[in-house]
Amino acid sequence: MAVCRKPLKKIEEGGAGAVHVDVMDGTFVPEVSFGQPVVRSLRPLTKLPFDVHLMVQNPERQIESFAALGADWITFHQEAAAGKEAKLIEKIHSLGKKAGISVKPGTSAETLKNFLNSADIILIMTVEPGFGGQKLIPQCLEKVRELAALRSELGLSYKISVDGGVNAQTLDSVLQSGVDIVVSGSAFFNGTLGWR
């Protein structure tokens, strides 16, 4: 795992607050990526919290495993868990982890309203999940603004995260939308984020 030390060191030195790990199953999204063996290998290499983003069908099958491997935050997609969201949030909390729920660009923020009082993190995908290096879909930031306004109006404390297409050109508009957590992969690692 020596090959993983360099990116993790860059993440730490760049001032990141967590390591975001995309887990893709090739079914919910077309790509396949990091699985349990990779997380098991990476976890001992950093003290930063691990933010595991389950872009998978049937996320309930993987929550316990990733919790046991050291995930600190576990986020699943509303679209993959329709009807089971509350149970999954409860399950993640019962394992002592922070629970996140995510939506794709085409899914309305309305689908999240019943979970805003129990989720710790609301992750808004600003690209179609599954591939890095895509352009941010600006209309998705309207969901962030809506969720930030609701949080204030209802006195809730969930964090709002944005994932996808964040780079030097989009960072300002993302930060002005009311977001708390910015996920950046391609732009961070290729040095074009323009932010350290």
Task: Write out the residue ranges for each language-model feature.
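Active-site beta-loop-alpha junctions enriched in small/polar residues
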Residues: 24-26, 55-59, 79, 104-106, ...
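Conserved, mostly hydrophobic/aromatic
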Residues: 11, 22, 66, 122, ...
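Glycine-rich, proline-tolerant flexible connector loops at the mouths of alpha/beta enzymes
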Residues: 19-36, 76-78, 127-135
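Catalytic cores of alpha/beta
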Residues: 4, 58-68, 107-119, 164-182
